[in-house]
């Protein structure tokens, strides 16, 4: 069965966002990443700025803080409301048209569909560090810290909401090392597997 939907999960600095965008362009299909923040904000009733800062990063302080987080009258935390809004938006987008969706636990949210190709992009530390230094104009020490912090927040969010382990190969159809394969080959492999 052809894969209508491609989800891209990625380590920070691996180029996963770039690879996803290029695959969407080459296939002539929709690409969703940060641009769905407005839709998530509308669905949740929270500001786009709040969603941008918190959608992939909650729960912020672990289970203890989560237990005491602010809740609405139904008992849902703000983090849960954001996740639920994100889930609804992703399901709507996947039902509407072929697309590439980057991040936001889309692989798990769409796990019951047969027409989804789930990809995890990772890379080697030196290449990821250099990419972050170049993209964000930071020194090596800051790049390493940004990488560790971002991946830790992504992992915490993913593990909490999916009850799976972020980056574990069995959760994905493909795991690709962008440092070893290069972006171009990653794109070609994804497109070939999506046929």
Residue ranges of each PLM-predicted region?
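Small-molecule kinase domains that catalyze NTP-dependent phosphoryl transfer to phosphate-bearing small molecules
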Residues: 59-66, 139-184
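Pre-Walker A (Motif I) flank of P-loop NTPase domains
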Residues: 2-11, 97
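RNA pseudouridine synthases
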Residues: 93, 109-112
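ATP-dependent small-molecule kinase phosphotransfer cores
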Residues: 41-98
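Short, amphipathic alpha-helical "lid/cap" segments that border enzyme active or binding sites
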Residues: 87, 183-191
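Glycine-rich phosphate-binding P-loop
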Residues: 8-21
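Conserved phosphate-donor/acceptor-positioning beta-strand/loop module used by diverse small-molecule
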Residues: 112-134, 140-148
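Short beta-strand-centered segment that lines the nucleotide-binding/catalytic pocket of NTP-utilizing
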Residues: 30-41
